[in-house]
């Protein structure tokens, strides 16, 4: 099992699919990485040589922000918005949708389970 960017990627899958197990690498970035390293698209992870795995690691370390660094950066961006007190920061702080969705109905994923209000009848 190859270990890239601190993640054990599955060995039987194609390289293009296996790279997507790394947080921060989706279809587009995985295709770009495979193209840069010049690995055939049908190659599986267990068929990679140590040199190819090393090249993949180098490309990811040099060109992409992945895993812990990406999570930390995202968290810091949200914290910065909350500290500024801007509208988006307030929405994050209150646990409400940030991007303008309606909240009168729906938004249950963001708001959590419905809370019963005592004495409220229709």
From Swiss-Prot:
UniProt keyword Ribonucleoprotein present: yes
Pfam families (alphabetical): Ribosomal_S13 (PF00416)
GO terms under cellular component: cytosol; small ribosomal subunit
A biological process from GO: translation
Keywords: Ribonucleoprotein, Ribosomal protein, RNA-binding, rRNA-binding, tRNA-binding
Protein's UniProt keywords contain Transmembrane: no
Region Disordered: start-end pairs: 99-122
Molecular function via GO: rRNA binding; structural constituent of ribosome; tRNA binding
Gene3D superfamilies: 1.10.8.50, 30s ribosomal protein s13, domain 2 (4.10.910.10)
Entry similarity comment: Belongs to the universal ribosomal protein uS13 family.
NCBIfam families: uS13_bact
Function of the protein: Located at the top of the head of the 30S subunit, it contacts several helices of the 16S rRNA. In the 70S ribosome it contacts the 23S rRNA (bridge B1a) and protein L5 of the 50S subunit (bridge B1b), connecting the 2 subunits; these bridges are implicated in subunit movement. Contacts the tRNAs in the A and P-sites.
PANTHER family: 30S RIBOSOMAL PROTEIN S13/40S RIBOSOMAL PROTEIN S18, SMALL RIBOSOMAL SUBUNIT PROTEIN US13M
Subunit structure, as described in the record: Part of the 30S ribosomal subunit. Forms a loose heterodimer with protein S19. Forms two bridges to the 50S subunit in the 70S ribosome.
Protein name: Small ribosomal subunit protein uS13
Source taxonomy: Bacteria, Pseudomonadati, Pseudomonadota, Alphaproteobacteria, Hyphomicrobiales
């Amino acid at each position: 099992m190859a270990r890239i960017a601190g993640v054990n990627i599955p060995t039987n899958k194609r390289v293009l699919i296996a790279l997507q197990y790394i947080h921060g690498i989706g279809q587009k970035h995985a295709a770009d990485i495979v193209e840069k390293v010049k690995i055939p698209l049908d190659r599986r992870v267990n068929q990679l040589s140590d040199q190819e795995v090393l090249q993949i690691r180098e490309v990811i370390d040099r060109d992409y922000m992945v895993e812990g660094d990406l999570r930390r950066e995202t968290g810091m961006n949200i914290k910065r918005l909350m500290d500024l007190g801007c509208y988006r920061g307030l929405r994050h702080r209150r646990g409400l949708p940030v991007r303008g969705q309606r909240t009168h109905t729906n938004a249950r994923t963001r708001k959590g389970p419905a809370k019963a209000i005592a004495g409220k009848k229709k």
